[in-house]
C-alpha cells in the first residue's frame, strides 16, 4: 500500500530519487575517500535522474496535451487518459471528467432546444385559447362583481352581528333570509353555535353556583371538626392532669409504705418501742388505705373521661366520612365541568379559525383549566381527609389502650388496698400478742415488700397513662391542625377557582330561559353571576 501511494505522488518519487542519489554520493565518498570523484559522481547522478524524470514528464505532458487539443477542436468523443498514477494521471482524469460533463451538457442543450421549439408551438395554440378564455373571463367577472356586491352586503350584516357577539353578547343572531344558499348555511351555523354557546354558559353559571354553595357547606363542616377536635384536646388534657395527680398520690402511698417498712425494722430491732411503732404503722396503713381509695376513685373518673373521648373521636370519624362524600361530589362536578369544556372545544373547532371561534376556544380552555384545577383541589382535600382519618383511627386505638391501662390500674389499686388491710390485721395481731412479735414482724415485712412492689407497678402504669394521654393530646392537636388546613384549602378554592369561574362567565350576556320559551326577543339579557356570586 505504501509503494502504490508513493507511485501516485510525483513529488514523493522525485524526493526518493534525490535520496537515492544522495545515498550513492555517500557510498562513493566512503568507498573512494576522494572528493573530486564524489562530486563528479553526484553531478552525474543528478543529471541522469533529471534526464529520466524530465523525459518521462515531457512525454506525459505531450500525451495529455495532444488529447486535450483534439477535445478543444470539437471532438468530444476523444478520451483523455494517462498511464501514470501520480499527479499527472490525476490531471488526465480531471480533464476526462470535464470532457464527459461537457458532452452531457451539450446533449442536454440539444434536448432543451427541441423542447423549446415544441413549447413555442404549444404557446401559439395556448394564446388563441387564452384569447377566448379572456372573453369568457370578462363575462364571468361582471357576474362575479354583481355576486360579490350581494355577498359583501350580507357579510357586512353578518360581521356586525358577530362583532357584537364577540364582545360577550350571546343574544345576537343573524338574519338568514337570503337568496344565496352558502350565506344562509353560514348564518344558520352561526345561530346554532350561539344557541349552543349560550346554553353552555348558562350551564357553567349554574355549576359555579352549586360549587360555591357546596364549598360553603364544606367550610361549615370543617369548622365543626375543628370545634370537636378542640373538645377532644381539652378532654385528653384533663386525662393527663388526672394521671399526674394519680402519680402524686401513688408517690405518697409509696412513701407511706416505706414508713411502714421502717417501722417493721425498728420493731425487729427493739421490742421496747413496739407499741409506739405499731401505732405509727397503723397510722401509715390508714393513710395508705385512704390514698388507695382516692386513687381508685381517680381511676374510675379517668375511665369515664376516656370513654367520653372515645365517643367524641368516633363522632369526628363520622364527620370525616361526610367530608369524604362531599369531596366525591366536588370530583364529580370537576369531571362534569371538564366534559363541558370538551364540548365547548368541539363547538370552537366547529366554528372554524375565525376570530369568534378563537375567542370561544379561549373560553373553552379557561373552563377546562378551571375544571382541572377543581379536580386537583378535590384530590388535595381527599388526601388531607385520608390523613385525618388515619390520625383519628390512631387516636382511637391509643385511647382504647389507655382505657385498658386504666382498668388494669384500678385492679392494681384494689389489690394494694387489700394488701394494706392485711397490714392492718398484722398490726392488730402484734398488739394482741408480744410472744408472737417475731413472727408478726416477719409477716409484716413481707407484706410491706409486696405492697411496695404493687405501688411501684401502679406508679409505672400511671406514667404510661400520662405518656399515652400526652400522645393522644398531640394526635388530636395534629388532627385539629389538619382540619384547619382543610378549611384553609376550601377557602382558597372558593376565593380563587369558583370566583374565577364566575368572573369568566360574567363577561357574557345570555337570554333568559323564560324569554326563549315564550318566543320573545333574544335581546333580553339574563342576570350574570359576578365575582361575589351575585347578579351583575
Swiss-Prot record:
PROSITE patterns: CHEMOTAXIS_TRANSDUC_2, HAMP. Keywords: Cell membrane, Chromophore, Membrane, Methylation, Photoreceptor protein, Receptor, Repeat, Sensory transduction, Transducer, Transmembrane, Transmembrane helix. Residues 124-145, 287-296 have a biased composition (Basic and acidic residues). Residues 221-459 form the Methyl-accepting transducer domain. InterPro entries: Chemotax_Me-accpt_rcpt, HAMP_dom, MCPsignal_dom. Residues 116-145, 278-307, 512-536 are annotated as: Disordered. GO terms for molecular function: photoreceptor activity; transmembrane signaling receptor activity. SMART domains: HAMP (SM00304), MA (SM00283). The modification Glutamate methyl ester (Glu) is found at residues 266, 473. GO terms for biological process: chemotaxis; signal transduction. Pfam families: HAMP (PF00672), MCPsignal (PF00015). One of its GO terms (cellular component) is plasma membrane. Methylated by CheR. Its main location: membrane. Residues 30-39 are extracellular. It is a multi-pass membrane protein. Residues 2-14, 56-536 are cytoplasmic. Coiled coil: none annotated. It is found in: Cell membrane. Residues 55-107, 149-202 form the HAMP domain. Belongs to the methyl-accepting chemotaxis (MCP) protein family. This is Sensory rhodopsin I transducer. It comes from Halobacterium salinarum (strain ATCC 700922 / JCM 11081 / NRC-1) (Halobacterium halobium). The lineage of its organism: Archaea, Methanobacteriati, Methanobacteriota, Stenosarchaea group, Halobacteria.
Amino acid at each position: 500500500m505504501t509503494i502504490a501511494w508513493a507511485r501516485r505522488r510525483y513529488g514523493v518519487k522525485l524526493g526518493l530519487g534525490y535520496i537515492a542519489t544522495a545515498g550513492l554520493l555517500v557510498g562513493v565518498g566512503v568507498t573512494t575517500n576522494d572528493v573530486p570523484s564524489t562530486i563528479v559522481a553526484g553531478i552525474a547522478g543528478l543529471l541522469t535522474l533529471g534526464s529520466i524524470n524530465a523525459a518521462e514528464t515531457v512525454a506525459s505532458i505531450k500525451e495529455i496535451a495532444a488529447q486535450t487539443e483534439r477535445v478543444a477542436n470539437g471532438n468530444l468523443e476523444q478520451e483523455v487518459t494517462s498511464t501514470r498514477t501520480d499527479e499527472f494521471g490525476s490531471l488526465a482524469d480531471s480533464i476526462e471528467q470535464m470532457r464527459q460533463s461537457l458532452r452531457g451538457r451539450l446533449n442536454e442543450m440539444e434536448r432543451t432546444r427541441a423542447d423549446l421549439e415544441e413549447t413555442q408551438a404549444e404557446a401559439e395554440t395556448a394564446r388563441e385559447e387564452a384569447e377566448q378564455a379572456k372573453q369568457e373571463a370578462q363575462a364571468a367577472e361582471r357576474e362575479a362583481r354583481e355576486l360579490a356586491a350581494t355577498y359583501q352586503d350580507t357579510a357586512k350584516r353578518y360581521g356586525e352581528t358577530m362583532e357584537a357577539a364577540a364582545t360577550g353578547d350571546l343574544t345576537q343572531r343573524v338574519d338568514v333570509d337570503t337568496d344565496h344558499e352558502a350565506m344562509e348555511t353560514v348564518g344558520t351555523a352561526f345561530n346554532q353555535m350561539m344557541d349552543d354557546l349560550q346554553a353552555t354558559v348558562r350551564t357553567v353559571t349554574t355549576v359555579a353556583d352549586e360549587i360555591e354553595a357546596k364549598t360553603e357547606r364544606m367550610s361549615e363542616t370543617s369548622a365543626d371538626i375543628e370545634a370537636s377536635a378542640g373538645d377532644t384536646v381539652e378532654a385528653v388534657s384533663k386525662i393527663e392532669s388526672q394521671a399526674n395527680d394519680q402519680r402524686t398520690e401513688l408517690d405518697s402511698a409509696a412513701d407511706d409504705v416505706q414508713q411502714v417498712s421502717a417501722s417493721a425494722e425498728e420493731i425487729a430491732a427493739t421490742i421496747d418501742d413496739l407499741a409506739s411503732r405499731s401505732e405509727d404503722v397503723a397510722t401509715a396503713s390508714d393513710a395508705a388505705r385512704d390514698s388507695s381509695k382516692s386513687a381508685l376513685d381517680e381511676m374510675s373518673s379517668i375511665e369515664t373521661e376516656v370513654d367520653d373521648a372515645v365517643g367524641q373521636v368516633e363522632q369526628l370519624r363520622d364527620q370525616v366520612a361526610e367530608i369524604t362524600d362531599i369531596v366525591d361530589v366536588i370530583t364529580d362536578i370537576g369531571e362534569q365541568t371538564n366534559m363541558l369544556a370538551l364540548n365547548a372545544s368541539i363547538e370552537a373547532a366547529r366554528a372554524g379559525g375565525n376570530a369568534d371561534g378563537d375567542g370561544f376556544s379561549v373560553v373553552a380552555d379557561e373552563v377546562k383549566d378551571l375544571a382541572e384545577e377543581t379536580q386537583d383541589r378535590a384530590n388535595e382535600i381527599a388526601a388531607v381527609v385520608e390523613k385525618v382519618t388515619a390520625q383519628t383511627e390512631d387516636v382511637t386505638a391509643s385511647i382504647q389502650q389507655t382505657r385498658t391501662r386504666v382498668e388494669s390500674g384500678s385492679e392494681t389499686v384494689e389489690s394494694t388496698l387489700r394488701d394494706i388491710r392485711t397490714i392492718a390485721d398484722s398490726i392488730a395481731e402484734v398488739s394482741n400478742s408480744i410472744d408472737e412479735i417475731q413472727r408478726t414482724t416477719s409477716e409484716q415485712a413481707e407484706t410491706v415488700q409486696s405492697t411496695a412492689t404493687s405501688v411501684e407497678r401502679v406508679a409505672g402504669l400511671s406514667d404510661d397513662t400520662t405518656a399515652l394521654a400526652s400522645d393522644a393530646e398531640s394526635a388530636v392537636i395534629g388532627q385539629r391542625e389538619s382540619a384547619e388546613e382543610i378549611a384553609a384549602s376550601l377557602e382558597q378554592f372558593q376565593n380563587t377557582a369558583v370566583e374565577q369561574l364566575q368572573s369568566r362567565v360574567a363577561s357574557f350576556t345570555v337570554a333568559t330561559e323564560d324569554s326563549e320559551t315564550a318566543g320573545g326577543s333574544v335581546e333580553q339579557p339574563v342576570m350574570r353571576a359576578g365575582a361575589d356570586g351575585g347578579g351583575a
